[in-house]
């Protein structure tokens, strides 16, 4: 079975150095000295390796000569660069090579021999056809951690079904929980790409930790579909035990009422969450100033409020139209109830908490310094790094020299259009 390939491979001497050795151009970080070979494109793979790169790993991003990662062509809004590429590829080294040619394949195998981790998010079977599958590479390098991210996983009846975030959201039930009663909606960010990328990062870190004990790598198989299933939360339990399909309730909560954004009299939305009996009491007395709701049998308990959601929601909506948003914010703040605003992106980027926590950073790029969103990871002894966004293939020659290629050999690879 492939999941045992790395663990069962015979340990052999490595010809190109030790895993975890110090390498050039690394900032201090929790993963300093870890080399990740990234055969990645689009979102799920690059987001995983950005997490690793932010924490100090040396990520070598393999790209197609001339065009690079397909996400480079999505738009050109960042002074000519793609917003998606800028988002996902800071702190990485760009290595441009044609893996389909024999000489390019040999370079890739030598790189894998000297890597701690290989991440690929090709369709299942593509890496094997290229000669870069787990069986072969783990036999050469038994310490290699080989992580595959795909739509549905490396086996099963949907293995070869093409996958995009929207399609997986639908197949995995995310869309069944999202939207309004008369129409479904997808989550606005690519949630299944992000979920699978985070599970991949966790899996890689776990495998690195286990390798410290065993000396051996292993194969990791992550799917967007299963990552989305794992994030369905309590909905499967309601179906298993009550036969209950989730309602689509828009920006409301399925089981807590009132909960969500309500338009105030000046057209600004105010979000609130009334989740406990205490909060319901405080909300009725001090915020809504409708003590009679506490005596209404339709609203006494959380199940009662859920059962009579329509009546209660309509009452709260009408109430909020009576005052401007700042009055509701004041009442909620004074009552110490959970609340917030619905901010646009411009407001988010100027949010005082984001500014205070330095979540907006600048990073070098081929077009000069550009703003990026920082990392939510905050480790007291392992700072996140903010180095640079690479131009296509900028690190190809240095990486080849590190592998022992001479200037003449590099020129030959370039003449043959391998790099």
Region spans (language model):
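Glycine-rich beta-alpha junction loops
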Residues: 66, 152-153, 224-229, 266-268, ...
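Aromatic-enriched alpha-helical interface/lid elements that frame and gate functional surfaces
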Residues: 258-335, 339
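A glycine-rich dinucleotide-binding beta-alpha-beta segment and adjacent secondary-structure elements
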Residues: 334-386
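Short Gly/Pro-enriched turn/cap motifs at secondary-structure boundaries
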Residues: 85, 249-254, 260-261, 272, ...
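Conserved Rossmann-fold dehydrogenase catalytic segment
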Residues: 154, 181-191, 212-228, 244-254, ...
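Oxidoreductase and adenylate-handling cofactor-binding alpha/beta cores
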Residues: 197-217, 230-242, 284-290
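N-terminal helix-loop segment corresponding to the beta1-alpha1 unit
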Residues: 2-213, 391, 397-419
């Amino acid at each position: 079975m492939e999941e045992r390939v790395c663990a069962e491979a015979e340990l052999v001497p490595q010809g190109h150095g030790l895993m975890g050795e110090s390498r050039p151009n690394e900032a201090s970080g929790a993963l300093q000295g870890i080399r990740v070979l990234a055969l990645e494109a689009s979102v799920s793979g690059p987001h995983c390796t950005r997490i690793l790169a932010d924490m100090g790993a040396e990520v070598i991003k393999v790209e197609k000569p001339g065009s690079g990662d397909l996400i480079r062509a999505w738009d050109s809004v960042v002074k000519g660069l793609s917003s998606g590429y800028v988002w996902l590829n800071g702190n990485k080294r760009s290595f441009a090579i044609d893996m389909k040619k024999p000489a390019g394949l040999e370079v890739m195998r030598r790189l894998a021999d000297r890597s701690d981790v290989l991440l690929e998010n090709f369709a299942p079977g593509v890496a094997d056809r290229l000669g870069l599958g787990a069986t072969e590479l783990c036999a050469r390098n038994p310490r290699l951690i080989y992580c595959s991210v795909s739509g549905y996983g490396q086996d099963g009846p949907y293995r070869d079904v093409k996958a995009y975030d929207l399609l997986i959201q639908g197949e995995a039930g995310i869309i069944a929980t999202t939207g309004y009663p008369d129409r479904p909606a997808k989550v606005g960010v690519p949630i299944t790409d992000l979920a699978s990328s985070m599970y991949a990062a966790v899996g890689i870190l776990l495998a690195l930790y286990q390798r410290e004990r065993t000396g051996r790598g292993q194969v990791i198989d992550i799917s967007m579909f299963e990552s989305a299933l794992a994030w369905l939360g309590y909905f499967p339990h309601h179906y298993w035990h009550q036969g209950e399909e989730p309602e689509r309730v828009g920006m409301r909560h399925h089981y807590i009422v009132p909960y969500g954004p309500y338009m105030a009299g000046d057209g600004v939305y105010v979000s609130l969450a009334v989740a406990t009996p205490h909060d319901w009491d405080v909300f009725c007395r001090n915020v809504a100033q409708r003590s009679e709701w506490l005596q209404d049998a339709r609203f006494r308990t959380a199940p009662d409020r859920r059962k009579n959601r329509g009546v209660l929601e309509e009452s709260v909506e009408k109430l909020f139209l009576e005052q401007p948003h700042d009055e509701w914010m004041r009442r909620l703040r004074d009552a110490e109830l959970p609340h917030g605003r619905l901010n646009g992106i411009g407001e988010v980027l100027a949010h005082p908490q984001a500014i205070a926590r330095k979540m907006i950073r600048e990073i070098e790029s081929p077009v000069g310094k550009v703003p990026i969103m920082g990392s939510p990871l905050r480790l007291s002894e392992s700072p996140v790094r903010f180095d640079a966004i690479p131009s296509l293939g900028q690190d190809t020659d240095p990486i080849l020299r590190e592998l022992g290629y001479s200037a003449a050999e590099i020129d030959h690879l370039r003449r043959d259009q391998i790099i």
